[in-house]
Amino acid sequence: MTITTINPQRRSLLRAASASVAGLSVGAPALAATGQASAIDQAWARAQGIVDQFKTPLVFPQRDFNITAYGAKPCKTIMVAGYVAHHEMGQVSTPAPGASDCYAAIAAAIAACSAAGGGRVLIPAGNWLVKGPIVLKSNVNVHLAKGAHVYFSNDPDDFAKYGEYDCGANGKLVISRWQSNDCLNYSPMVYAYGQTNIALTGEDWTSIIDGQGGVPQANGDAWWDWKGKRKAGPRQHQAQNLVNPNNPKSIRDVAPGLSDAQVALMEGKDDKWRTDEAYLPTLSEAGVPAAQRIFGRGHWLRPCMVEFIGCSNVLLQGYQLNAAPFWQHHPVNCSKLEIRKVLMESLGPNSDGFDPEACNTVLVEGCTFNSGDDCIAIKAGKNLDTQFGPTQNVVIQNCVMNSGHGGVTLGSEMSGGIQHVYAQNIEFRNAHWATDPLNTAIRMKTNMNRGGFLRHFYVRNVTMPNGVSLKPLVYKPLPGSPIPPNAVGSSAGAVVTIDCDYAPTADNVRTRPPIVENIHISGVKVGNVQTKDGPRSCYQALLLLGPVDFDYNGDKPAEILPIRDVTITDCDFGTPVNAAQPWFLYNVRNVKLTNVTIAGKVHDTTLSA
């Protein structure tokens, strides 16, 4: 196997947090210690300061580079049997056999636009097959006209052909992040690295980028099958959750300096660490450099649909995204990024809508989400991959959220920390409540593996006309945990969920206690839906599961802090199914409820447990 040396610029992006991410100044007043109400007002003033930074739009030279001038040809489409959701078969549209590949034409148009000093690469109306990634360059806006539908190839090999790093049999790969761990992997469908002043835009929601995540490949599997756990049909050939014989039999084969105790901790008691989804984080724990974490061909880690790394002044606007193989949008270590009026329509596994990671100064405005996982999930590194620092200074406003695991979610990959996040004027519409409900609306999740800090999170003016899931989805604690099995619905059923014991059985290394504090929620109004038992809004109003000290398996005792300093004010949570026990609390301190109505009863109290 051969691999080129990562150039100094990219090495620095992989190893060191950028100054822009490290800074906290966003042009808004600092928080003043003049009482809780004043502090919250100051926080929202800070949020407005973030929004104000996006008043001046990005500017691109007024010249177009139409992809048809570089040889692109539209294609016809046919309907085939495929997945319309993770476990639901149906008819899906795909390019007809013999369709022309537009990869080279789009790449040539972007290169010409960049060489001219920037402008707009225009994808006109029509259906376009692209057998490879669209790679953005500085000062280039890739724009989809009204009625433009870009179908990215569903053949994984097409995303292991054009990367910068020749990894032999694994393909030509790119620097990527997969579930918050750095690696060399298949290219995302839309990709940029270290660029500035870039945009992906559409005329309206008939401007579509399509990842074809549910369209079968030549061997009968689709991208979504790589997740594993198929409920129906033949077993997939391979998946991220199955032991991969291409991975070493001992982590010491790639990290020979590890002690016996370190090896035992990382590998655990079985060979599950050799599945691709566990092998990559194990490489991080072992300190293996990103340049040696080689995946791509022979592995089963699906690429994100849109991934930008180390970019600044980024605009995503006005298009629809369908059927992503994995996370839909994943900016990493980016600054001053805006996503506006984008429709995210992807019901596959891990189809998070928007996952900003280790980013600074982000605005999410006027977007609509219908996702197979979290609608928004803010990330900040995992295991030892925290070099880019926290995600901070994020405003989410005027959005609509339908199906998904969580609406506005922080975590679970948050080892680098998350702070100064503001969500306001959100409608958790949950339109599909009867068949595909939103599991939980406001969600924070971490565990003893992720660790990190989560603080200064503010939510206000939220409506939920159809509540959230009425059924709890219980989690599996570690054997021997003080949390009894099948007892805590931390994955679904609560309107507000703070889960510090998220999926504890998935991680062998649990040595980083999380810190969750200073959470302020106000103006949440939850509606009821009509059931056979009467009007209901959720299973429970609140679920606050603090860190479970039993889970910690580090060398020495660590300070395990409770969830603390949470205020919930002027909220009406409707009528929970479990109105007799409207909240679950474990290891929490100073949770203050003020004018909080649950099942018609007003609560003014401070809770600890």
Residue ranges, per PLM feature:
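Extracellular beta-rich repeat passengers
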Residues: 433-609
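An acidic- and aromatic-residue-enriched active-site/binding cleft used to recognize and process polar
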Residues: 126-128, 139-141, 147, 155, ...
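Extracellular "leader-to-stem" segments immediately downstream of a signal peptide or signal-anchor
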Residues: 1-141, 145-310, 317, 326, ...
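Short glycine/acidic-rich loop motifs that flank beta-strands on beta-rich extracellular proteins
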Residues: 118, 131-132, 153-155, 212-215, ...
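Right-handed parallel beta-helix
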Residues: 146-147, 196-207, 312-322, 335-346, ...
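Asp-box/BNR beta-propeller blade signature and adjacent active/binding-site loops
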Residues: 61, 75, 82-83, 103, ...
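Exposed loop/turn and edge beta-strand positions of beta-sandwich/beta-sheet ligand-binding modules
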Residues: 302, 310, 333, 350, ...
